């Protein structure tokens, strides 16, 4: 599992990016967020996640808010 910080997240569109120190930003889709109810992330929020290979490159999976 990697740890990072939410760089930005557009709740209306349901996606954003997670910043990982020393690495490229990782795409995150709302469907990858592990929580019940409304799935969204806040800018600057610390998260833990796995990286999987998506259709357009690396993306976050199993995202957990810290």
Swiss-Prot record:
One of its GO terms (cellular component) is cytoplasm. Transmembrane segments: none annotated. InterPro entries: Cold_shock_CspA, Cold_shock_domain, CSD, CSD_CS, CSP_DNA-bd, NA-bd_OB-fold. Signal peptide: none annotated. Keywords: Cytoplasm. The gene is cspA. One of its GO terms (biological process) is regulation of gene expression. This is Cold shock protein CspA. The keyword Cytoplasm applies. Involved in cold stress response and in the susceptibility to an antimicrobial peptide of human cathepsin G (CG117-136). Regulates yellowish-orange pigment production through a still unclear SigB-dependent mechanism. It is found in: Cytoplasm. GO terms for molecular function: nucleic acid binding. Induction: Up-regulated in response to low temperature. Residues 1-66 form the CSD domain. PROSITE patterns: CSD_1 (PS00352), CSD_2 (PS51857).
